[in-house]
Amino acid sequence: MTSKNSGNIKKETENEESIYLKKIGERLRYFRKKAGYTNSEYFAYENNISRPQYGKYEAGANIQLNTLIRILKLMNVSLEEFFTGFNEY
């Protein structure tokens, strides 16, 4: 019984993580556009970021915190600003 419950918890956790990563991707897209970059590939190219990888971040791929901080600095966005209202999406 414990094994079955732990499997359900794992699925719930993975689903929750997926939702948060999608939200992070949506926020990255929002702030990129707010910074004046209509195209994600152009933003990545201009800032020496792998274009395919940046596209994956906006699509909801897992992103390391240090990478997120670096990208936000390029957009002149603080972590506080980035996560303000995060749960309202």
Protein language model annotation of sequence segments:
Residues F83-Y89:
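Short amphipathic recognition helices of helix-turn-helix/homeodomain-type DNA-binding modules
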Residues G36-K56:
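Short alpha-helical DNA-recognition segment
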Residues Y30, E41-Y42, R70:
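Alpha-helical residues within helix-turn-helix
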Residues K33, Y45, K73:
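Alpha-helical residues within the helix-turn-helix
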